[in-house]
C-alpha cells in the first residue's frame, strides 16, 4: 500500500490534509546575498525593524540578517508561523531544504512533534556552488546511493533514524552544471526504483525547466511524480507554460506572498503579483490541468514570517483561497490542488 513518509513515520495519504508542497523552516541562504544599493546601505545593514522593513521588502537579499534563516530568532519565528498554519487549517508541510542549504532535520522533527503538522523532508542536492568538498564531486552512482539511503534507511537524529519522503529540491543553474546534471539523473534513477516524488528547482530562464525534464525523463523518472517548482518566476507566457505542461509533471506556483515586482535575483523580469498568480492558475484550470497544479510560498527569508512583518505559512489558506473562490474557483478544484495533488505526488511504496 502506498504511504507518505513523514519525519515521524509513515502515514496514509488521506491524513495529510491541506499541504504546502514547497517550503523551508530553516536554511542558509547567504550565498544569494547581494550588496545593498549605496543609498540604502545603512538601513539594510541595520537590524530588521519597522523603520527598515520597507527597505528589506524591496531588497530582501541585501540584508544579511534576512538571509540568515537559521539562527535562534528565525527558528522561533518559524515555529510561531507553523502553529498559525495549523490553526488556520494546515495539515502538512513539505520541507525542501536539500544538501547545500544546510537543512536542519533536528528542528524539523521538533516542529512535527510540537505543532502536530506533518513534515516531509527532502534529500537531493542544491546548486553546485553551494556544496561543500564532501559533496561537490559526487558521481551519479554516489548520489543515487545517498538518496536511496536517506529514503530507505534514514539519517540519525538524536539517536533515532529519520527518513526523507521525497527527493528535492534538486536545483540547477543554466546552462546546467555537470554536477547538477548528475543530481537530476540520480533523482530520475531513484524515482524509477522507489516510486517516490521528486521536486526540481529550475534556473530563472524559460529553457531551464524543459532541459531539466529531458534529463530526468531520460534517466527513467516518471513525469507524474515530478514537480517543477518556481514556474511563477520562470515561464511567464501562458502558451509556453501550456507547452511545458504537455510533459506531464506538476506545475507549481510557489511564490505566493511575494508581491514586490522588482526581483533581485533576476532584474531582467518583473515578479508577478498574487493576483496574477491566481489569474494564471484559473487559466490553467480552464485548460483541464487542475490535477497538475500545486501551490506554496517558498518562504526562505525572515521578512516573510509574521514576526518580521510578513505573511507566514497560512497566507494561501487565509488570503489566497478566498480570493480564488470569489473568482469562481470551486471548493472541489481547491481541494484537488491543495489536498489530492500533494497526496498523489508524495505517496509511494518504499
UniProtKB/Swiss-Prot annotation:
Q: Which residues bind a divalent metal cation 1?
A: 22, 24, 169, 298
Q: Which CDD domains match?
A: PTE
Names of the cofactor(s): a divalent metal cation
Q: Which GO terms describe its molecular function?
A: hydrolase activity, acting on ester bonds; zinc ion binding
State which Enzyme Commission number(s) the record gives: 3.1.-.-
Annotated residues that bind a divalent metal cation 2 are located at: 169, 201, 230
- Keywords, alphabetical: Hydrolase, Metal-binding
Q: Which InterPro entries match?
A: AryldialkylPase_Zn-BS (IPR017947), Metal_Hydrolase (IPR032466), Phosphotriesterase (IPR001559)
Class in the EC hierarchy, top level: hydrolase
Q: Name one Pfam family in it.
A: PTE
Q: Which residues form the signal peptide?
A: none
Q: State the free-text cofactor note.
A: Binds 2 divalent metal cations per subunit.
Any one of the GO BP annotations: catabolic process
Q: Which family does it belong to?
A: Belongs to the metallo-dependent hydrolases superfamily. Phosphotriesterase family.
The protein depicted here goes by the name: Phosphotriesterase-related protein
Organism annotation: Drosophila erecta (Fruit fly)
The lineage, from the top, is: Eukaryota, Metazoa, Ecdysozoa, Arthropoda, Hexapoda
Amino acid at each position: 500500500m502506498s504511504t507518505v513518509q513523514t519525519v515521524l513515520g509513515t502515514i496514509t495519504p488521506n491524513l495529510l490534509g491541506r499541504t504546502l508542497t514547497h517550503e523551508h523552516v530553516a536554511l542558509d541562504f547567504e550565498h544569494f546575498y547581494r550588496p545593498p544599493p549605496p543609498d540604502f546601505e545603512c538601513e539594510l545593514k541595520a537590524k530588521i525593524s519597522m523603520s527598515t522593513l520597507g527597505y528589506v521588502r524591496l531588497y530582501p537579499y541585501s540584508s544579511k540578517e534576512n538571509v540568515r534563516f537559521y539562527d535562534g530568532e528565525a527558528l522561533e519565528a518559524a515555529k510561531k508561523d507553523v502553529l498559525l498554519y495549523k490553526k488556520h487549517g494546515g495539515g502538512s508541510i513539505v520541507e525542501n531544504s536539500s544538501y547545500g542549504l544546510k537543512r536542519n532535520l533536528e528542528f524539523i522533527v521538533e516542529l512535527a512533534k510540537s505543532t502536530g503538522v506533518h513534515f516531509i523532508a527532502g534529500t537531493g542536492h542544491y546548486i553546485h556552488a553551494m556544496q561543500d568538498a564532501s559533496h561537490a564531486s559526487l558521481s551519479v552512482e554516489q548520489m543515487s546511493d545517498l538518496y536511496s539511503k536517506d529514503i530507505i534507511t534514514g539519517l540519525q537524529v538524536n539517536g533515532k533514524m529519520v527518513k526523507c519522503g521525497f527527493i528535492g529540491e534538486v536545483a540547477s543553474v543554466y546552462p546546467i552544471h555537470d554536477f547538477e546534471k548528475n543530481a537530476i539523473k540520480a533523482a530520475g534513477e531513484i524515482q524509477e526504483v522507489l516510486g517516490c516524488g521528486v521536486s526540481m528547482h529550475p534556473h530563472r530562464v524559460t529553457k531551464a525547466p524543459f532541459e531539466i525534464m529531458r534529463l530526468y525523463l531520460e534517466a527513467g523518472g516518471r513525469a507524474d511524480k515530478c514537480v517543477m517548482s518556481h514556474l511563477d518566476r520562470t515561464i511567464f507566457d501562458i502558451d509556453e507554460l501550456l507547452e511545458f505542461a504537455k510533459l506531464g509533471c506538476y506545475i507549481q506556483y510557489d511564490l505566493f506572498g511575494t508581491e514586490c515586482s522588482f526581483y533581485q535575483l533576476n532584474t531582467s523580469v518583473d515578479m508577478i503579483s498574487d493576483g496574477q498568480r491566481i489569474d494564471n492558475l484559473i487559466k490553467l484550470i480552464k485548460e483541464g490541468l487542475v490535477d497538475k497544479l500545486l501551490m506554496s510560498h517558498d518562504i526562505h527569508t525572515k521578512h516573510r514570517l509574521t514576526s518580521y512583518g510578513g505573511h507566514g505559512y497560512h497566507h494561501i489558506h487565509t488570503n489566497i483561497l478566498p480570493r480564488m473562490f470569489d473568482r469562481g474557483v470551486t471548493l472541489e478544484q481547491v481541494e484537488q490542488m491543495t489536498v489530492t495533488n500533494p497526496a498523489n505526488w508524495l505517496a509511494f511504496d518504499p
